[in-house]
Amino acid sequence: MNKVIELKEISVKYNNKSDLVLENITLDIFQGELVAIIGPSGVGKSTLFKIIINSLKPINGQIKVFDQDILKFNKKQRHNFISKIGFLTQTPNLIYTDNVYNNIIRSTSKYKNNFYKFFSILTRKQKIEIFEKLDELNILDKAFFKVSELSGGQQQRVEIAKLLIKDVELILADEPSSNLDKQTSIEVLKILKNISEQNKTILVNIHDLSLVKNYFDRVIAINNKQIVFDKKTKDISQWQLDKIIKSRF
């Protein structure tokens, strides 16, 4: 199995603060894994994502993503690198006054400031692909609805559709279901699981620990600046997971 992310003895702190946020983190993430990142608030889960996308430099250690040393990237290399990564957050990055279809077109367009120029050169195949992705995500009937008319779960599906159209290789999801009810959260995780089975790698910062066992391949817990737990979910029961989490947090 190919390594997508390799962190070796990474330590991080913000600005000139003396306290480390993460300390000597060593971690490998493999292609096609759906990984839950868990831990108390403020322990460095979001910081880990910033390290992976090279928006925050560690004070020591080595980082490889897609088998590239991202700490040595120039501007062009970083741009190409970021284009392979998709992001999901609590609040989808959408234009709420526009419809679903147009939001997806805008997200893939190099003519973002000239939307109608891009729309006019879309091929029939590209248009069909957009509708196919919306159909896969059960929101085809919402294609020409304004985003503001959709539920929170449907809005997240639109955001996911954007990532599918862009064909990203790695998805970093920072609590994408925290504003959703339990059933909708499960539906979103099922979608992410299906995407990971297509050899896409997905890391999810998640707060609802009851969802970890059934919907993730692997769980990594961070606390006190360290990785304190890293297991395949198939190798541990929900009872064992709950017990270990309670003892570490």
Placement of each model-derived feature along the sequence:
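The feature captures the beta-strand-to-loop junction immediately N-terminal to the Walker
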Residues: 38-40
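Helix-to-loop junction immediately C-terminal to a conserved catalytic motif
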Residues: 53
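Conserved ABC transporter NBD signature motif
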Residues: 61-69, 81
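Conserved ABC ATPase "signature" region
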Residues: 117-141
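Conserved ABC ATPase signature
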Residues: 146-150, 154
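Catalytic Walker B motif of ABC-type/P-loop ATPase nucleotide-binding domains
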Residues: 171-174
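H-loop/switch region of ABC-family ATPase nucleotide-binding domains
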Residues: 206-207
